[in-house]
A protein has these predicted regions:
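Hydrophobic N-terminal alpha-helices or hydrophobic patches in metabolic proteins across all domains
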Residues: 1-183
């Protein structure tokens, strides 16, 4: 089974979707997704004490411009093991503007089963300390792979949904041979 392709399509909708987790909250190991194998692989280990402030994961049946599933920051009160399936809904998006002119986007997702975070409806409701920790972690992570970040931007639910829709259409075109309808 390849989790990227074999998850039922109705479990991946823009308003609620299943995330498969990668990096556990607090971990200094950075796991990345191997699309061919459908598994996680160790990308690098952080030699500092900057661990993931939140769980991270990937959205099946989506495809970014890099040819990989959407990465997500998963707002959840507890660390979750890698490859756990979690029902989530989008809260917003964080865009990392890279010094080389590129952009790296992450959808910010709230775990539906988490009483605290499921009440968070917008990025504005994420506590400032949590937002700062996310930015610090993502900047450090990009620095480790030699992609320095020049600016970060928190965007609302509408931007997250547009990004999700574009990546889902890209997936359908690339892997299912479906041409998206013109709007």
């Amino acid at each position: 089974m390849n989790i990227w392709h074999d998850l039922q399509p109705d479990l991946v909708r823009r308003e609620e979707y299943t995330v498969f987790t990668a990096n556990s909250m607090g971990s200094t190991a950075r796991l990345s997704f191997d699309g061919d194998a459908g598994l996680l692989c160790l990308d690098h280990l952080s030699d500092s004490n900057i661990g993931a402030p939140n769980n991270t994961g990937f959205l099946p049946r989506t495809c970014t411009e890099d040819g990989l599933p959407i990465e997500t920051i998963l707002l959840c009160s507890q660390p979750l093991p890698a490859m756990t399936l979690v029902r989530c809904r989008p809260v917003g998006l964080i865009a990392l503007h890279l010094e080389d002119g590129g952009t790296c986007n992450y959808i910010i997702s709230a775990a539906c089963a988490d009483e605290f975070w499921s009440a968070c409806l917008t990025v504005d409701e994420i506590p400032t300390a949590t937002r700062k920790a996310i930015v610090r972690y993502l900047r450090y992570d990009q620095q480790l792979v030699r992609r320095p970040v020049s600016a970060t931007e928190f965007c609302g639910l509408e931007q997250a949904e547009k990004y999700f829709d574009a990546c889902q259409q890209n997936y359908l075109l690339r892997y299912c041979g479906k041409i998206p309808p013109q709007s």
